[in-house]
Amino acid sequence: MSVSVLSPTRALGGVSGLLQVVSLLGLVLLLLKVAQLYLHRQWLLKALHQFPSPPSHWFYGHKKEFQQESELPLLLKRVEKYPKACARWLWGTSALVSVYDPDYMKMVLGRSDPKPQRTYKYLNSWIGTGLLLLEGQKWFQHRRMLTPAFHYDILKAYVGLMANSVRVMLDKWEELVSQDSHLEIFGHVSLMTLDTIMKCAFSHQGSVQTDRCSDQGEEVSPAEGGRAGEGEEKEDLGLPRHPPLCQSKYGLPCRDHLDQMPYTTMCIKEALRLYPPIPVIGRELSKPITFPDGRSLPAGILVSLSFYGLHHNPTVWPNPEVFDPSRFAPGSTRHSHAFLPFSGGSR
């Protein structure tokens, strides 16, 4: 009698053969992926050979180094050792070039390279696709629409409101400091910012810094009509609702005095140099680039523009850790791209 086609022995043999085929295909795909990663690493090594960096591990790059030490101190060490730029290996097959030289900055920001979506996509869920993440034509359109709203003449009406919000915060600080020498300011500054936005953008009456939480979503329409900030234009920056002080020769400063306070402007710029609001941005090169010193990078390389590193570069700013407002004194000269607290060029 012949053996049945559906016998258990033949069925097991069929399953075993299928597993062998699947295992073989998986092994082939794995080898192809390993070869692809190897070739990509070799391409990166060749592309970045002109940009030295500290020794890195073949698999996890410089990750261990950055895990053992804080990011900023380590960055400053690299800025001092490699004054213009250096390579940073994120993984064995992923790397970028960190730039903190004004000539390099000018070259990259003068182009229209796209933002690296593999990095910026994680910001979408946090801040949304706004002006910071837009690029190309959409960025130009949104920028063109928003720029008139931030014209100096329009912002004049809101100076009093902004100063009022800051004053409320400072009063709270005085009370808290008298109780404890330690004060965490982040939450207070965030609430002050919300207070300013509520007053200027939505004409909210009151202060979210002092109101109860249940009151913060109440009436936001103007009580007396007119635009937000109307009636505040003549307030001084130190004590609102006292116009005579603003008019006094030795009174507290008001909005009209801002242009006559060069040292205050110097201090603000020096603070922005030490602590830039935008510490770093990224660009993915869409075409090769050659820098003024002859070094070059091919298309596809990720470039990290470190404004924090630029502002703390001793070859650009002598004694960069010292707070020295005289760096921005009228008549002082510097590279056009040595001071970039809010980035520069097209987005």
Annotate each language-model stretch with its function:
Residues S2-L30, W89-V97, D153-N164, E174-K199, ...:
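Cytochrome P450
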Residues P148, A329-R347:
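Cytochrome P450 heme-thiolate "Cys pocket" and heme-binding signature region
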Residues T193, I197, A201-F202, T210-Q216, ...:
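Central I-helix of cytochrome P450 enzymes
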